[in-house]
Amino acid sequence: MAGPGPGAALESPRQLLGRVRFLAEAARSLRAGLPLPAALAFVPREVLYKLYKDPAGPSRVLLPVWEAEGLGLRVGAVGAAPGTGSGPLRAARDSIELRRGACVRTTGEELCNGHGLWVKLTKEQLAEHLSDCSLDEGWLLVCRPAEGGARLVPIDTPDHLQRQQQLFGVDYRPVLRWEQVVDLTYSHRLGSRPQPAEAYTEAIQRLLYVPPTWTYECDEDLIHFLYDHLGKEDENLGSVKQYVESIDVSSYTEEFNVSCLTDSNADTYWESDGSQCQHWVRLTMKKGTIVKKLLLTVDTTDDNFMPKRVVVYGGEGDNLKKLSDVNIDETLIGDVCVLEDMTVHLPIIEIRIVECRDDGIDVRLRGVKIKSSRQRELGLNADLFQPASLVRYPRLEGTDPEVLYRRAVLLQRFIKILDSVLHHLVPAWDHTLGTFSEIKQVKQFLLLSRQRPSLVAQCLRDSESSKPSFMPRLYINRRLAMEHRACPSRDPACKNAVFTQVYEGLKPSDKYEKPLDYRWPMRYDQWWECKFIAEGIIDQGGGFRDSLADMSEELCPSSADTPVPLPFFVRTANQGNGTGEARDMYVPNPSCRDFAKYEWIGQLMGAALRGKEFLVLALPGFVWKQLSGEEVSWSKDFPAVDSVLVKLLEVMEGVDKETFEFKFGKELTFTTVLSDQQVVELIPGGTGIVVEYEDRSRFIQLVRKARLEESKEQVAAMQAGLLKVVPQAVLDLLTWQELEKKVCGDPEVTVDALRKLTRFEDFEPSDTRVQYFWEALNNFTNEDRSRFLRFVTGRSRLPARIYIYPDKLGYETTDALPESSTCSSTLFLPHYASAKVCEEKLRYAAYNCVAIDTDMSPWEE
């Protein structure tokens, strides 16, 4: 009876088209702040639950019935169940006694909190079991999180089976699930149709309720709230994320890390980097997952990296028991089953590789696959919506947690329908059709899609090219580039900028040489080799990354006090005025017509998206939205560019005539100033036409249009370059925030994130250098940590792996500066007298030692 889940095959084109119709209508409702289609909120009035048949259990079970205040979600009702607080349960009001195999009738209204999954009973349903019950409604706990399964299982009711209708020789059972009601409502069919079961109208109305002040922006905030708390799937989980919370490994190399276990690509592999016979993969399983088969992908061509003997352990915490011991055929290329037919949920499964072929020291695994029978999922937890959790979401604060919970349930249903058809819409759907454009209007909702990550990965794989047969070698003079950066007016053509030197160096030398297409596999992580003139360096990646960082700094300087050495971007008015939000941002220069270089910038952005490198461009959401194809608006997006102008026009719109004439007199004409300080006419001859009070609405409209479109051509050129490297389907599937993060990296460099990415080699755990190092980084600002990251790795944003070794002086206290090798992302850490000295030396090195000292070698050309 269940409708198709995400990614499942739909029964017919009719069902597919019906769901597309539904999505289009729902998207329009969301944008307009209207109630969603009623079919999405369907709740049956009656569901029959049967007591789970456990032969080892008692023949009779008492099921406690709890009373809930109001609708069952009240903040501050500590101990109340169900509710938004999941503290100790207070005493139940009554109990229902059932024999094993007996049934209880409930409504279809459900609620999930920290105690588990609850279902609601009406007064009539309670009376079937309790003759003197005084409750108007009650709640039964169907499933606890720790049980790994439901004590009560929903089934078809006998009444439903008796009411089956014989229509055209087909038995039509009344439809119970909301997915089926959506299909019935929006799929056209000839002849008689199944009918939905009797609806629980009160529950449906509660789900559909939209507060009077609710807007589409509130829904977007709710989606981001859910994503922050639920939706950030571990990027390393890939193909097993529906079963696994997280994957940990004993060790890994930077290039062949844990993500390779689940990328569904047999050409990649996880490779350990540790001691012999101490390799393991630990899976933290999602609640309710029971493993039917656990498979490892191996390849005999890995020689002595191939696992020979694997032992699997499982259980809770540190209490793991041996489950299987498997010897692997040394000639195998493919999957080997190392665990099967489990009957209970195991929170932790640990795969230990105890022996490799030919006594190999390290191991390679090309994949982990799981086949599972998922027990009933508990659903969205109502406890999430406590006021303390909503501080970062002002639009949601003050809204009843009960309303937020039910709205979130409805949005999750919408996402489930979207997931079921997403692979039909992208990339094959005609983008000119209205339906697709309507769905794109709610792109932020894709954050919660389970199908999207695999679709993005597949689109990128399908469009990638082979890596170049040779690596371009570029000769870069950074001394001239530094002189240009200090005084750009001496070099108006910007020939000495690193950006220009790289651009010219990558041009094909003759008509037969193909230009770089930047669509390489992710593992091709050095796009060109740099020879820095008058600097000794063997570039194994560090010099290349430094050139990207230099170009980023030239395009969008991080300091507001330095001139902008290239003409492609200009500082926003907010940065110049020191007002409003996003005061460190840049926008494309409306006066710059060098569209070929804008296109190349777009190609570099696409290459960064495909690979592991970053091109850090400080652009506001106003620009990223245009690049990703999202709609921009004056009120939402332009305050990040020129907040003073936005406020001025807002005041002008509502001002009276006397105030307007006093403030503007005859000085305001039909002109406006663009971001590059260029004055443009809004109408022909606008310089000489005064704006009268009656003309102000037209003037405001013209200013908004001119400013919103001021860099339209430049953005279009960047997008054209981006689309040469990244398929349109990928941009359709990514939100603008995700596009920015994939191109630029994570601007927030936290100590917690650095701890996960930092590895100490040849240090004792008690070494004071380790303690001083973390104390120093804790005292750093985010800018300090970003500078430090670049000093060590050549990257200024995360993620970036760091390896730390003792310096050559060992334990001798010194005041020497730390050294780094960006090619290997290595820091050589001296022994300092105190954490304060360590902090000072690290900070000085981060800001003043950007040259690659330890990569030096004699070089003469």
UniProtKB/Swiss-Prot annotation:
EC number: 2.3.2.26
Residues modified to N-acetylalanine: 2
Catalytic residues as annotated in Swiss-Prot or TrEMBL: 823
Native organism: Mus musculus
GO molecular function: syntaxin binding; ubiquitin-protein transferase activity
One GO process term, biological-process aspect: protein ubiquitination
Catalyses which reaction(s): S-ubiquitinyl-[E2 ubiquitin-conjugating enzyme]-L-cysteine + [acceptor protein]-L-lysine = [E2 ubiquitin-conjugating enzyme]-L-cysteine + N(6)-ubiquitinyl-[acceptor protein]-L-lysine
Key words, A-Z: Acetylation, Cytoplasm, Phosphoprotein, Transferase, Ubl conjugation pathway
Localization terms from the record: Cytoplasm, Perinuclear region
Stated name of the protein: E3 ubiquitin-protein ligase HECTD3
PANTHER family assigned to the protein according to its UniProt record, in alphabetical order: E3 UBIQUITIN-PROTEIN LIGASE HECTD3 (PTHR46654:SF1)
Associated pathway: Protein modification; protein ubiquitination
Main location: cytoplasm
Domain spans labelled HECT: 512-857
Modified residues (Phosphoserine): 12
Iron-sulfur listed as a keyword: no
Assembly and oligomerization: Interacts with TRIOBP. Interacts with STX8.
Function: E3 ubiquitin ligases accepts ubiquitin from an E2 ubiquitin-conjugating enzyme in the form of a thioester and then directly transfers the ubiquitin to targeted substrates. Mediates ubiquitination of TRIOBP and its subsequent proteasomal degradation, thus facilitating cell cycle progression by regulating the turn-over of TRIOBP. Also mediates ubiquitination of STX8.
InterPro entries: APC_su10/DOC_dom, Galactose-bd-like_sf, HECT_dom, Hect_E3_ubiquitin_ligase, HECTD3
Entry annotated with the keyword Nucleotide-binding: no
Domain spans labelled DOC: 219-397
GO CC annotations on file: perinuclear region of cytoplasm
Transmembrane intervals: none
